Amino acid sequence: MHKEEELWTGNIDDFLRSCNIKAIISAPKEEEIRRCYELLQRTNQLNSSGRRLSIDKVREILQDNRYESFVLKSSDKFGDYGTVGFLIINKNGERPTVTDFVISCRVANKKIEPTLINYLANRYGGELLFNYKRTLRNGPMHAIIEELAMQPYASSDTYETYLCKHDASYPDIVDLRER
């Protein structure tokens, strides 16, 4: 992709559209739990919380009705990237809240991350809270907050929480589907 991107003379959104980026989200299956755990352990730059959950804690969350979780798979005209993301939403508060969001650097800067968060804001009635804990390495995750113009909502010793409102005008670069 990098060579083709370097040769592209149009704007980046047009280039990304030409890549035919596809993303599929679904509830994690038993055989995907280990990959979800691996993403939580290995992902630094695109990790919203910085948390390192044990595999037992991941299983516990997946069975808890207060949470909804998604795995993210992606492909484009250059290939199939497999399972590249994992996201946990706490549905128990005043608004659904993304507590953890990790995505592989293999698909960074393809607009998948903000497309997914914007989609979920719409799915949950137009608004979604997003927990973010700044670490030494996850600045790229904060860029998503800025790209979606999330507004500061609350702050604690643990997280900064942002309000994400669905933006119907967000570019349709990624073909995102839910299974």
Predicted segment positions?
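Terminal substrate-recognition subdomain of acyl/acetyltransferases
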Residues: 1-21, 122, 126-179
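A conserved beta-strand-loop-helix scaffold within acyl/acetyltransferase catalytic domains
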Residues: 28-96
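Low-complexity, flexible helical/coil segments
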Residues: 60-63, 108-110, 154, 163-167
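Generic alpha-helical structural element
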Residues: 25-29, 47-50, 109, 130, ...
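Generic, low-specificity signal for short hydrophobic/alpha-helical stretches with a mild N-terminal bias
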Residues: 18, 40-43, 71, 98-102, ...
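Acyl-donor binding region in acyl/amide transferases
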Residues: 77, 83-152
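Conserved helicase motor core of SF1/SF2 NTP-dependent helicases
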Residues: 1, 6-23, 27-45, 78, ...
